[in-house]
Swiss-Prot record:
<comment type="function">
    <text>Protein L1 is also a translational repressor protein, it controls the translation of the L11 operon by binding to its mRNA.</text>
</comment>
<dbReference type="InterPro" id="IPR023674">
    <property type="entry name" value="Ribosomal_uL1-like"/>
</dbReference>
<comment type="subunit">
    <text>Part of the 50S ribosomal subunit.</text>
</comment>
<keyword id="KW-0694">RNA-binding</keyword>
<dbReference type="GO" id="GO:0000049">
    <property type="term" value="F:tRNA binding"/>
</dbReference>
<dbReference type="Pfam" id="PF00687">
    <property type="entry name" value="Ribosomal_L1"/>
</dbReference>
<keyword id="KW-0678">Repressor</keyword>
<dbReference type="InterPro" id="IPR028364">
    <property type="entry name" value="Ribosomal_uL1/biogenesis"/>
</dbReference>
<keyword id="KW-0810">Translation regulation</keyword>
<keyword id="KW-0699">rRNA-binding</keyword>
<comment type="function">
    <text>Binds directly to 23S rRNA. The L1 stalk is quite mobile in the ribosome, and is involved in E site tRNA release.</text>
</comment>
<dbReference type="InterPro" id="IPR005878">
    <property type="entry name" value="Ribosom_uL1_bac-type"/>
</dbReference>
<comment type="similarity">
    <text>Belongs to the universal ribosomal protein uL1 family.</text>
</comment>
<keyword id="KW-0689">Ribosomal protein</keyword>
<dbReference type="GO" id="GO:0006412">
    <property type="term" value="P:translation"/>
</dbReference>
<dbReference type="GO" id="GO:0015934">
    <property type="term" value="C:large ribosomal subunit"/>
</dbReference>
<dbReference type="InterPro" id="IPR016095">
    <property type="entry name" value="Ribosomal_uL1_3-a/b-sand"/>
</dbReference>
């Protein structure tokens, strides 16, 4: 449900959203950003990552594909799943992908490519653009577990990102919202001369949608 005639400041929008939730479970809070670049079918898909300073409100599970000292670093950093060629074989055979992110060292990517068709459609393929192909394993595990989220504009030119849940305070949701807005704004194509954001909305899983302004 959306009243298109009412536009709120980000703080007001969050307040309205938190007041309107009625579900008996902890609803997610999401931001939807309509971009001025058009739909993804025109080749203007926007994709990237944002680090949420207040996290996601849940455990983020991380898998690391590496060997030797890098595998040890991954375990020490708290990675949930760590393996090398054996793990790749398990994934080929249908191992449950019980993780949110997959990180790999650059020297291991030639082997990881063997499961690209499995990881790719689920958004789990290690990607240098997301920082998930790296030798700095410990640092990346920490970043991802702290609340890194990936985003990509859909076929309608809209970016959808979870910024927390209704158990978060207004201040924490604002911090996460600013982080997402900054990350998306940073990907504005040089060909876009005017405003990059056409409209921004906040909504919860089962609640209303609130249009906000003053972010981009």
């Amino acid at each position: 449900m959306l009243d298109k005639n009412i536009v709120y400041t980000p703080e007001e929008g969050i307040d309205q959203l938190l007041k309107s939730t009625t579900a008996r479970f902890k609803e997610s809070v999401d931001v939807a950003i309509k971009l001025s670049t058009g739909d993804s079918r025109s080749g203007d898909s926007i994709r990237g990552v944002a680090v949420l300073p207040k996290g996601l409100g849940r455990e983020v599970r991380v898998a690391v594909l590496a060997k030797g000292e890098y595998a040890k670093q991954a375990k020490d950093a708290g990675a949930d799943v760590v393996g090398d060629s054996d793990l790749i074989e398990e994934i080929k055979k249908g191992r449950k992908l019980d993780f949110d992110w997959c990180i790999a060292t650059p020297d291991f990517m030639s082997q990881v490519s063997a499961i690209a068709k499995i990881l790719g459609p689920r958004g789990l393929m290690p990607n240098p653009k997301f920082g998930t192909v790296t030798f700095d394993i410990a640092k990346m595990v920490g970043i991802v577990k702290s609340g890194q989220v990936r985003f990509r504009s859909d076929k309608y030119g809209i970016v959808h990102v979870k910024i927390g849940d209704v158990g978060f305070s207004r201040e924490d949701l604002m911090e996460n919202l600013r982080a997402v807005v900054s990350a998306v704004q940073g990907l504005k194509p040089a060909t876009v001369k005017g405003a990059f954001f056409k409209a921004v909305f906040l909504n919860s899983t089962m609640g209303k949608s609130f249009r906000i302004t003053g972010l981009g």
